[in-house]
């Protein structure tokens, strides 16, 4: 059975839907997985993030978390959001990664960035570069 990867649309007033459409239509995604959109295209004011587009982005993140909990999807790819407007819509996490960790009740998680030739798992996220050295150790 193929793993199912969900894609959120991000902030639909910005580049989120374009990024997802480009990825899904590129022909470069592995055929060993199935891909599903989380949420639906909303009729929002385009051009700059706004409270309405942030509210929809937050709703789609909640839908993705529920789909993960229920086993409907196995992983999620999140499109870009504007954190400032997302926080204005009631999103209280530093980023989407921490949101999913809390919703899925896990302390063992990582943000990964994947490209054509390289996948990177980040050791730290959403902190200042100045703080990074004090947070790294060989035990973890």
Regions found by a protein language model. Name each.
Residues 1-98, 132-140:
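Contiguous, glycine/small-aliphatic-enriched amphipathic segments in soluble metabolic enzymes
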Residues 27, 112-113:
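Short secondary-structure boundary/capping segments
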Residues 30-32, 106, 115:
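Short, well-ordered coil/turn elements that cap or connect secondary structure elements
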Residues 34, 108-110, 119:
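Proline-centered loop/turn at the N-terminus of a beta-strand
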Residues 97-107:
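A glycine-rich helix N-cap at a beta->alpha junction
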Residues 113-140:
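Ligand-binding beta-strand-loop-alpha-helix segment within the catalytic cores
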């Amino acid at each position: 059975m193929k793993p199912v990867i969900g894609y959120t649309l991000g902030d639909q007033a910005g580049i989120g839907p374009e990024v997802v459409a480009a990825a899904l239509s590129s022909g470069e995604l592995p055929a060993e997985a199935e891909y599903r959109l989380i949420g639906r295209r909303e009729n929002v004011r385009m051009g700059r993030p706004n409270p309405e587009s942030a509210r929809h982005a937050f709703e789609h993140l909640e839908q993705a978390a529920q789909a993960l909990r229920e086993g409907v999807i196995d992983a999620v790819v999140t499109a870009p959001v504007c954190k400032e407007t997302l926080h204005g819509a009631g999103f209280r996490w530093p980023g989407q990664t921490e949101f999913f960790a809390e919703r899925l009740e896990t302390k063992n998680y990582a943000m990964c960035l994947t490209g054509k030739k390289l996948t990177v798992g980040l050791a730290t996220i959403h902190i200042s570069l100045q703080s990074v050295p004090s947070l790294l150790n060989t035990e973890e």
